[in-house]
């Protein structure tokens, strides 16, 4: 549920999610333009970060800064559903890196996907521009 949009939010987004047992909220990733926070509303999700995995409890709040230090993933390793509220800044345009696979997603200012690729050889600046 996109809570932020429903209440007219423009600069801060909020999404409430339920995660069933054995599932993950998203792949392990990091944002380069937007900061995110998680608030645990129900259950005991496992949080994966660059420091490893640890279990969160109801009421816990964690901030994920921009860049690789803020990489994160929410995992439900329990036998009942969990509920979390994700908050984020809403800077238009975004670069998201999926660290397990090396994929990178670039989003435009209208939230459209511009590029979704794995890094490879870097093209020369003028390559193909003739």
Give the ranges of each region predicted by the language model.
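Short, conserved beta-strand element in jelly-roll/cupin
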Residues: 16-20, 30-48, 87-91
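Short beta-strand His + acidic residue motifs that chelate non-heme Fe in jelly-roll/DSBH
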Residues: 27, 47-48, 64, 71-77
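Short acidic-glycine-tyrosine-enriched beta hairpin
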Residues: 50-67
